[in-house]
From Swiss-Prot:
Keywords: Developmental protein, DNA-binding, Nucleus, Repressor, Transcription, Transcription regulation. This is Transcription factor Sox-14. It comes from the Eukaryota. PROSITE patterns: HMG_BOX_2. One of its GO terms (cellular component) is nucleus. One of its GO terms (biological process) is nervous system development. SMART domains: HMG. The gene is sox14. Residues 8-76 bind DNA. It comes from Xenopus tropicalis. Acts as a negative regulator of transcription. May function as a switch in neuronal development.
């Protein structure tokens, strides 16, 4: 690499004047010694010198400086910058090691933390539009035949066991129908072929006679139902 023509060297100081001869001598005595080690030893020896021993080298440095200023009156020290390619190489002197599977971000999460993250994602899914769901909840192809059969039997089971007043609320035939207006005797029931959809039907509307809750009677020998039923006894007295 050729040096620029306009580059002017700095004048030597007292240490450089002294070390110029000492460096050559030390390099001849220790040919395998690195240049940086030679500079370190020369610096240590220079500090051990007294002021009287340094005086001739200080005077020589002043003379060289005066001569340098006379030859280059407009001289200004401009340090040379490193080329850009060297700067790029120095940037990657200490590359980061690959941690692989020992990454603490992978192994540090416990099962509870993972479950909480999954639960948070499911809660966030509730605020998304329906089209963003990975699958349709009403798509019958997502369910097996056993699941569909259980879903069709579920309304009848609930109406017969857990809803004793289902008949008075318009749940006819054990199906989950919507309460409609008295003038329109139309209810909706789950489709037997596709439980995800409901279909209307024209079943009979609930009447006032169905509003009476079911009553269980215990009859002993010699007793009749008329004596126990207040509604029927009042009706007989009115007649």
């Amino acid at each position: 690499m050729s040096k620029p023509v306009d580059h002017i060297k700095r004048p030597m100081n007292a240490f450089m004047v002294w070390s110029r001869g000492q460096r050559r001598k030390m390099a001849q005595e220790n040919p395998k010694m690195h240049n940086s080690e030679i500079s370190k030893r020369l610096g240590a020896e220079w500090k051990l010198l007294s002021e009287a021993e340094k005086r001739p080298y200080i005077d020589e440095a002043k003379r060289l400086r005066a001569q340098h200023m006379k030859e280059h009156p407009d001289y200004k020290y401009r340090p040379r910058r490193k080329p850009k390619n060297l700067l790029k190489k120095d940037r990657y002197v200490f590359p980061l090691p690959y941690l692989g599977d020992h990454d603490p971000l992978k192994t540090g999460l416990s099962m509870s933390a993972t479950d909480s993250l999954l639960g948070a994602s499911e809660k966030a899914r509730a605020f998304l539009p329906p089209t963003s769901a990975p699958y349709s909840l009403l798509d019958p192809s997502q369910f097996s035949s056993t699941t569909i059969q259980k879903m069709t039997e579920m309304p009848h089971t609930l109406a017969a066991s857990t809803l004793p007043y289902a008949s008075t609320l318009g749940y006819q035939n054990g199906a989950f129908g919507g309460l409609s207006c008295p003038s329109q005797h139309t209810h909706t029931h789950p489709s037997p072929t596709n439980p995800g959809y409901v279909v209307p039907c024209n079943c009979s509307a609930w009447s006032a006679s169905n509003l009476q809750p079911p009553v269980a009677y215990i009859l002993f020998p010699g007793m009749t139902k008329a004596g126990l039923d207040p509604y029927s006894s009042a009706h007989t007295a009115a007649m």
